[in-house]
Amino acid sequence: MELEKEYSCIENNDLVLSKNISIDKSYQETPEAYLDDICKVVRCTSHSYITSCDIRDSCAYIMGKTEICLTYFNDSDELIYTDFVEDFDETVEIGNVSENAFCYATVCDKYCNYRMINQRRIDIHSSFCISLYVYDKKSCSCISKCENSKLQLNKSRIACVDNAVLSKLDIEESFVLPSNSNGIKRVVCFNVECCSVETKIIKDKILVKASMSLYVLYSNNDNCLDRAEYSFDISKIVDVPGVDEACHCIAKLCNGSLFVKAKSTDEDNGGVIDIYGDLYLTCVTVREKMQELVFDGYVLNADTSNKYSTFNCLSGCEMSCRSNSSKLNFELQNEIVKVEFLCVTPHQCSIKNNKLIVEFEICLMYTGKDNTLQYVNQIKAVEQNVTSVDLANDIRITSFDYTISGDKTICVNISYDYCGYCGNEASYNILSEMEITQERKSYPALTLYFAKQNERVWDIAKQFSSDIEMIKKENNITGDCLETNKVILIPGI
């Protein structure tokens, strides 16, 4: 017997590939001709970032840059800062995907080593890890209506990553040093911390407002070290096709190539600090919706053969933003006399084995007991127990300070916000097809059935191809499962 049925198409963007790619690069760098020779290296760091990530011909094409920052002493014991920018590209096979597939990537720096060849040339080895995420549209057919049948329906609020867009922000700002400062000779090192603070979504566009903090260590006119801090706001309107007010957005900002220059002036002030360069912004949008799912079904007074499809999604979803604080001890090998420069940046954030793991990179330049300038950096992790997973996240450092707690120990106090779109991973078996294999002969008007405790009324009704509502009414059952062992009456159809 052919049944009249109607079908619905359930669609979702599945994470079809999540891959970490470790990359090691070696470079030989030479300072610009106008810079002094390298006598002693104090600080050599690098950070890598993505400039584009696209899918073509079953491959993900990733392009990016690595900025190398070098602080060194010249022959006159003056501190000099310079930087180098190198390109990189990676091609990753992702298999067969549809034209709806999209991807994005993030970078986590691992380490940077150097070896001096001579006073004009230095070998630099940089290592970092790219995390690639590829999403593709998956759909499955689900029976929505069927004649003379009972369908087990459930409405669930589900969510998936809807899109991911990478865009570039150009920045250019100037800051005047206080008039009572002793001027500025040259920049020694700096750190820029940027984070999104607000997003507003309209049709096909997202407005991202962000805050930037600039920390600069510089030498003054007496060739002594001094510090300056500045904060400013930036904003960007990003075109994101398909996004609307029903979506949520996680905006992740990453430093690109940034340059900080010192400028002396004849005016009555201490000088000017200029910052210019670029940032890269990844907007990951998440869409949630109420979805009607049919888990099971049967035809009254007939045996059926059912087919099911697996549907993976995130359920019980919400945008979670919470504030935290941590105290992290920074252990040194040498005794510390004075902290010259300290900065804290988010390094990585992930959820593994029901734990939220947030890593911070702490960078410290200090004067030791032997009156030498030292630089060290360490990665510190903070763990929290969680019961959910996130589709996307961002860490925002709101403040940090430090205390010298021992001759070789610094205690760093960090306040930060975690913002993520969280939920529970779910996998459902969806009723995709149902066919009659045999029509049953009519049952007696009533049939006795010895039901067990916790047995589902649905399973009993399906077993006898009877009407579940009639069974509940006949036996005064209000719940979906039996609370005790019970003899019940099964109405015939």
Segments predicted by a language model, with ranges:
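Short acidic DE-rich linear segments
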Residues: M1-L3, G492-I493
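Membrane-lipid interaction segments
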Residues: E2-Y443
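Primarily a LysM-type cell-wall glycan-binding module
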Residues: I436-K473, T478-I493
